[in-house]
Amino acid sequence: MKVKSKMNDNEKNNRIISEYNDLKNKINLWNKAYFDYDEPLVEDSIYDATLLKLIKFENQYKFLDNSDSPTKNIGAKVSKKFSKVQHQFPMLSLNKAYKFDDLKIFERHINKLGFFPNYFLELKIDGLSISLKYDNGNLIQALTRGDGISGEDVTENVFQIQDIPKQIKYSKPIEIRGEIYLSKSTFYEINECQKSQNLTIFANPRNAASGSLRQLDSSIVKERKLNSFFYSVTNPLDHKIKNFNDQELFLKENNFQVPSLNKFVDTIEKAYEFIKDFEKNNYREKLNYEIDGIVVKVDDFSLYDILGQTSKFPRSMIAFKFSDISIETKLIDIFISVGRTGKITYNAILEPVIINGTLVSAATLHNYEYVESLKLNKNDNVKIIKAGEIIPKVVSLSKKNSETIFKRIEYCTSCNEKLVQPEDEVDQYCINKKCLMIRLRKIEHFASKKAMNILGLGFQNIEKFFKLGILTKYSDLFFLEKYKNLIESQPSFGEKSFNNLIESINRSKSNSLEKFIFAIGIKQIGERSAKLIANEVKLLSNLINFDFEKLNNIRDISCKTINSLKCFFSDENEIEEIKIILELGLDFKNLENEFESKKLQGLNFVITGTLSKPRDFFKELIIKNGGNVLNSISNRINYLLTGEKSGSKIEKAQKINTIKILDENEFNKLI
C-alpha cells in the first residue's frame, strides 16, 4: 500500500508540475505578444485570472521551481523594443482593498506605530504608469514601470504627448510620476479608425494607451492624442514638499495635469464614506477617462519612511477597488443545479476572470425568466459583477454570438421528473422526494459550516457514502462510526480522516436548536428565522407538535414561513428523521445567551498556527465560554493561542505588552 501511495503522489506531483508549466508558458506567450508586437491576445481580466491561478499554485505547492515565474515581477517584462533602464527608486504597485475591513487593517498598522494621520484621496487612473526625470528644468528621460525595477525608455514618444511639460520652472533634478491614458472619446475615435482600415481594435483604453506609447514610429504616438495625470514627486521632502497640498501646488505651478476630484479626510471612516458616495452617485461614468478605484494615501510625507514598504507595496497608501466593476467574459455553458428544496437554479460557466481580487469562473443566472430576459445562450459575451461579498452575477448581454435563447428546462436533470412552477413564484421546482440530488443536497446542507458544521464531509464523500448505502439521510451521519472498516478502505479516506470526521460529528451533538432547525433544510427558513423559531420552541422535542400559529406574533416570521413549517412537519419522513435524532438522546435546546461557563467572558483571542484540532473547534470553545475570536493582532487582544508554524502574529503580539501568548496546554488550563 505504501508503494502505491508513493506512486500516486508522484503522479499527482507530475500533473501539478505540468499544469504549472502550462500556466507559465501561457503567460509568457501573452507577454511576448503584448510587449513585443503590441497585440494583446486576451482581456486583462483573463490575464489576471491566469496569473492569480499561478500564484495559488506557488503558494500551495512549495516544490515547484518558480525561479522564472512571472510572479517574481511587479509588472510586465520589459519590452525589447526600447532600451532597458533601471529605476533610481523602484516603482511599486499598490496593495488593494475591496471592503471597509481592508481599509481598517491598513489603518491599524499605522495606528499601532502610534500615528493617526489625515488621508488624501485621489482617483486611480486606469492607464500606463510613467516616471519623468527633469534636470535644469528640462525633461531628460521618461520610463515606463516595466517590472518595477527597470522600465522602458520611451522618452522620444513622451515628447509627442501634448499635455506633458517638456520644460518646467523648477531647476533642481527631480522625478515626477503619473499615468498616461487615453480618454474615452479618443479611444472610440481610434477604434472607429481601426475598423475602417480593417485593423484589430483595442480591447480597452488602457491597452490602447500602452500600445500607442510603444509605437516605433513616434508620429503615430502624436496622432493618438494621449493624455496624462501626475500625482507623485519622488523624495518630496528633498524638495520641501511636506504633504499633498504642497505637492498639488507644485505640480500645477509647473504645468502638470492633476486629477480634479481629490479629497482630504481625517479618518478612514470618512474615506470610506467618500468612496461609497462616489460609487452611489455614479461619478465614474461621468468622467471622460477610465478609473478603477480610489487611492487612500497618508497625507504626511514625513511618515513614509517610518511606515516602510513590502517588496511590492508601500504601507503608506492603498488602492480601494470599486465593488461594482463589471467585467466582460464569454458564457461557455449553462448548467442546471437542483437544491435541497428542489429549487432549480440556472448557472453560467464562464471564461475565468478576476473580479474584486477573486477568480470567477461561474455565476448565477437565477431562474429561466432571468435567462430569457437577458436573451442568453452559450457562447454569448456577458458582463458580470461581484458587488461586495455576494455571489457573482451575470448582469447583461454585451455581445450576442448565438442565434437563439437557451431553452427552458422542463424536466429535472437529476431524476427526470416533470418540474413545477408555483403561480406566485419565478422559480421551478422538482417535487420528487426521492430525487437523488435533493437527497444529497439535504445532507450536504445539514453538514455545512453554517448548519451543523461537520468537517471532512464534502459533497464527493456524501455521494460516495450514499452509493455505499451508509448515508442516505442526515440521521445516518450519527451511525457512521459503525462503518469504520468500510470507510477507511475507501481511496483517500484513511484512519486519520475517519477519526476527524467522527470527532466532528460528535462535536455537532452539542450544537444549538437554531443550528439544527436551519440544518434540516425547511423551505423559507434561513439562519435568522431558525433563531427566532428556536427562541419560541426551546427544545427539539417540542418542535414536532408545536403550534406554529403562535409564531404569527413574531414580526419577522411571515405567513409564508409558517405555512412552510406546517408543510414540512406534515411529512412523515421528516418527522421520522427527527424521532431518530431524539432517540439518540439529542434533544437540541435553545442556547440563547447561554455559555458553558463565563470563564472567558469579555476576553478577546486570536488563534494562529497548526493546533491538534481544527481551528473552528477552538473558536467555538472560546465563544461558548463567553470569549470573542478576532482575526488580527491589536491592543484589543487579551490572548494569542499559538500552534506550530505560528508565523508573524507572535512577533506582533510580543510588541504589545498586554497580550499573553498561550500554547494549547496553557489554553486548556484557562478553560
From Swiss-Prot:
What positions does the entry give for NAD(+) binding? 44-48, 93-94, 122, 145, 179, 297, 321
Output the Gene Ontology terms for molecular function: DNA ligase (NAD+) activity; metal ion binding
Q: Which residues are involved in binding Zn(2+)?
A: 412, 415, 430, 435
What biological process terms from GO does the record include?
DNA repair; DNA replication
Task: Report the active site residues.
Answer: 124
The record's section on CDD domains has: BRCT_DNA_ligase_like (cd17748), LIGANc (cd00114)
Q: What Pfam families would the database entry show?
A: BRCT, DNA_ligase_aden, DNA_ligase_OB, HHH_2
- Cofactor(s) needed: Mg(2+); Mn(2+)
How far does the signal peptide extend, from start to end residue? none
Q: What residue stretches are annotated with the BRCT domain?
A: 595-671
Keyword annotations of the record: DNA damage, DNA repair, DNA replication, Ligase, Magnesium, Manganese, Metal-binding, NAD, Zinc
* Annotated catalysed reactions: NAD(+) + (deoxyribonucleotide)n-3'-hydroxyl + 5'-phospho-(deoxyribonucleotide)m = (deoxyribonucleotide)n+m + AMP + beta-nicotinamide D-nucleotide
Q: Does the keyword Cell inner membrane apply?
A: no
Q: What is its EC number?
A: 6.5.1.2
Job of this protein: DNA ligase that catalyzes the formation of phosphodiester linkages between 5'-phosphoryl and 3'-hydroxyl groups in double-stranded DNA using NAD as a coenzyme and as the energy source for the reaction. It is essential for DNA replication and repair of damaged DNA.
Q: Its family?
A: Belongs to the NAD-dependent DNA ligase family. LigA subfamily.
Q: Which NCBIfam families match?
A: dnlj, PRK07956.1
Can you name this protein? Answer: DNA ligase
